[in-house]
Amino acid sequence: MTRIAFDFALTSYCQSRCKTCPRTNNETGEPEDWLVIRHVPFSKWKKNTIGLSDNIELEYIKFCGQTGDPMMHPDITEFVNHAFTFCNNIMISTNGGLRNTDWYTEMGNKYGEELKIVFAIDGIDHETNWKYREGVDFNKAWNNMVAYCNSPGYTQWDFLVFDWNWKQIPEVARLAKEINVDEVIYKINTGPHGLLDPAKKSIVEEMICQANTI
């Protein structure tokens, strides 16, 4: 039987102004004029997913998208709950600075490791994270990630490596182990904003290799 994964973009709303995100105008920091800011209605999505798992094996369902953070959707809980009626492996990708610790704790307790939440946090402090994820409350994002780590849910920390934060890689690895993050993914930024000096790339790659052994 064919194994298929789906990535649903639920919203084009986002509180962040990431400079190389396709939704952000690099000059103004505001959403691009062409972007229609809207949420996908839950009722419409629910109707459109009827029979989705017929004759196929769903590997996973991911709520991410290109122009918005799924946690901005007011009905995100309903989307997750319904997705679990036809798939047992759900993933949410978020900047972490939305909702509160109670929400993450409750969802982790309810679904355990079958619900993976990917936290895109690019620093170990507010100042560093803000350099790319402008608009995200770092303390809130961090507390939400810690709360999810303390639940039975599966936590992934995505750390995008820029020219200004690569020296934090060892501390990221240490903190991730301290708070019981299940998995850390280090991704070297390829966009123009904060592009890593090519001369440092081999050093950074070695640091990542070392971090993955911690």
Regions found by a protein language model. Give the residues of each.
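N-terminal pre-triad scaffold of radical SAM enzymes
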Residues: M1-T24, E59-G65
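Radical SAM enzyme [4Fe-4S]-AdoMet core and its adjacent flexible, acidic
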Residues: A9, T24-S43, S53-N55, Y60, ...
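A short glycine-rich beta-strand->turn/loop micro-motif centered on a GG-aromatic cluster
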Residues: M91-G96, I185-K187
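Glycine-centered loop/turn positions within well-structured domains
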Residues: S16, I90, H126-E127
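Short glycine-centered, acidic/aromatic-flanked micro-motifs in structured strand/loop junctions
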Residues: G65-Q66, T94, F159
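Acidic-and-aromatic substrate-binding clefts and catalytic sites of carbohydrate-active enzymes
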Residues: G68-P74, G97-D102, F162-K167, P192-L196
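A short acidic, amphipathic alpha-helical/loop segment
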Residues: N48, D75-H82, D102-M107, E171-V172
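Conserved SAM-binding loop
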Residues: L10, P70, I92
